[in-house]
């Protein structure tokens, strides 16, 4: 079966065509600057990237270009669209309505629309992708895979905020969590890779990238996660603040003469590693290079990140009453050797010891703790597209 995996953003669209039998990526690509000027970067397996500048006024033109690229003589991986057997869509927010992936129907589309106010930048774009694919490839089954679904197993003590209860009852204000597809994929793989008992396992997944979240997973089910109602909560991220004292918002807003939108822009786009480094960069690689060159602000930003991760890990060990494995994934988690080393340096009380040679590897599935470490620590590359493909195949 060939599955087209679509991740539709507000002005971009990522895709992969995956053979579900072999789990081989047949083709992949990215549409950028949709609604502005438009650019398609596509790559057939085993071939060089092809870049096409073209007008993409809407997502419909972008998706049509993707479908053309999949079937043309130069970049095509299939002879015709009849070889696309199913489409899997990333959907950011399913609220409390979706605890698992679902086959797309009119009723599902309506329910996703009802979650739009929880993800006003992402859900409408996800829905556009679903509708356009339905229009251009009628009859091909579509599946929605939700970022929030994996976290729906959290108990009330983990997802409720210390706010008036009517805000939850009336507006569904609660912790939802994100990166669920990645956390699910990596936690399952950790159990397999590390030889844990799936029915008696406690795993902490550290998904660390430009956006970062940590989750506590007991016997394959999420019991807590760091992101909240929105992806702003939790650890320090590329440009997001993570956890702060909420009263800071009023204090800074008065000092800087900002309204609520202006303050949210600061927290989402000017804070995190970018803010802590004095606006140097939100990219860990830049900060690490600067820190090695003596930039103290960059070094402090990295320290704040590692310290915050270690605190959440410690909290989740308490929440689960123990831990079998701690896993790093995503861009920083898979590649940032210093961050992993700094985080593990705080975990001596757990009997964790780091194999520095193993930790020197980047982007590989590898155990980075020593054989005598009481808790296993590993790096496991995430693959959200493959996870969406698997979810899609399971439902169609």
Model-flagged regions — what are they?
Residues 3, 12-56, 228:
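Short glycine-rich, Thr/Ser-proximal phosphate-binding strand/loop in the N-terminal lobe
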Residues 297-299, 303-324, 333-396:
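Internal helix-turn-beta structural module
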Residues 9, 89-92, 208, 327-335:
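Glycine-rich beta-strand-to-loop/alpha-helix junction loops that act as flexible
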Residues 150-255:
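Glycine-rich phosphate-binding loop of actin/hexokinase-like ATP-binding domains
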Residues 70-122, 143, 149-160:
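Short beta-strand-loop/turn "lid" adjacent to the catalytic site in phosphate-handling enzymes
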């Amino acid at each position: 079966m060939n599955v087209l995996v679509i991740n539709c953003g507000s002005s971009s669209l990522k895709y992969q065509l995956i053979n579900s039998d072999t789990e081989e990526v047949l083709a992949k690509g990215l549409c950028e600057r949709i609604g502005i000027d438009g650019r398609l970067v596509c790559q057939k397996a085993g071939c060089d990237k092809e870049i096409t500048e073209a007008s993409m006024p809407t997502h419909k033109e972008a998706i049509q270009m993707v479908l053309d690229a999949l079937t043309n003589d130069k970049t095509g991986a299939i002879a015709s669209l009849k070889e696309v057997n199913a489409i899997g869509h990333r959907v950011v927010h399913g609220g409390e309505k979706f605890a698992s992936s679902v086959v797309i129907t009119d009723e599902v589309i309506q329910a996703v629309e009802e979650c739009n106010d929880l993800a006003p930048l992402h859900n409408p774009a996800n829905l556009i992708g679903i509708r356009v694919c339905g229009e251009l490839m009628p009859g091909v089954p579509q599946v929605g895979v939700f970022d929030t679904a994996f976290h729906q197993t959290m108990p009330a003590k983990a997802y409720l905020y210390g706010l008036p209860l009517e805000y939850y009852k009336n507006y569904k204000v609660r912790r939802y969590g994100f990166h669920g597809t990645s956390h699910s994929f990596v936690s399952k793989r950790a159990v397999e890779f590390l030889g844990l008992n799936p029915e008696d396992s406690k795993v902490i997944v550290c998904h660390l990238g430009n956006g970062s979240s940590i989750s506590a997973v007991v016997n394959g089910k999420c019991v807590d996660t760091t992101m909240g109602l929105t992806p702003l909560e939790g650890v320090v991220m590329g440009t997001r603040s993570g956890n702060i004292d909420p009263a800071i918002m009023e204090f800074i807003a008065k000092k800087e003469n900002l309204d609520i939108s202006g303050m949210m822009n600061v927290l989402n786009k000017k804070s995190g590693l970018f803010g802590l480094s004095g606006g140097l960069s939100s990219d860990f690689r830049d900060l690490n290079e600067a820190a090695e060159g003596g930039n103290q602000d960059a070094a402090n930003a990295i320290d704040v990140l590692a310290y915050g991760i270690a605190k959440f890990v410690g909290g989740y060990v308490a929440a689960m009453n123990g831990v079998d494995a701690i896993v790093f994934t995503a861009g920083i988690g898979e590649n940032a050797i210093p961050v992993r080393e700094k985080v593990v340096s705080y975990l001596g009380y757990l009997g964790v010891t780091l194999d520095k040679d193993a930790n020197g590897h980047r982007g590989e599935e590898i155990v980075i703790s020593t054989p005598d470490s009481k808790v296993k620590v590993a790096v496991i590359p995430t693959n959200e597209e493959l996870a969406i493909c698997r979810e899609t195949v399971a439902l169609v």
